[in-house]
Amino acid sequence: LGKQVIAKFKLDQGKDPQSYGIGIKELWEIDPARHKAGLALHSAGWPLDENTYGGSFLYHMEDNKVVVGFVVGLDYTNPWLSPFEEFQRFKTHPNIRWYFEGDEAKGIAPGKRISYGARAITAGGLLSLPKTVFPGGALVGCDAGYLNASRIKGSHAAIKTGMMAAEAAYDALQAGRSHDELSAYPEAFENSWLHTELNKARNFKQWFKKGRTVGTLMTGVEQFLLRGHI
């Protein structure tokens, strides 16, 4: 629906073309001996090649549950590459499979996959962000493209943009307005910590088009040394 709205109102006019990734996620239940509640792990690259963007996440939830996932940029050039198979290869890494495999000698049971799924994600960042308001409505969260691809994070952005849009809608209703544009919403975004965060990461995908080594180096320089001032 969001893509239809963007096309109908030409909200992406003058913006960089959006780029996408595919995220694959599994929910596991693992042995308590290998569960560390609150542990969060991220990785970039392996098993992907130098010129293919991607990374992973592994989160330890409560009740011995673990969420593990892998994201691959859909601009990869190898026609034989399978994001699903790359995800399965990723889980064979010694530091990752340790959480899922059992050890009969130590009485550790192997993990059990409970559920799985996949979805496309927007990865273009701030430079691909469309106009987020139109007559009578607004775009928030991943539908607009607020994902911070450099950190594989989007939930916090979805919550924040939802709050800002709701506040703008409330003010409009209190003023007796209807079916116009909630201009207060994009204004609030531009003055928020979220805009600052996404602005620092705005060139992330552009750098990684030059390969993982250059992308990692320049992203580090831009985000941590120059604080996005480039």
Which residue ranges define each predicted feature?
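Residues forming the flavin
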Residues: L1-H229
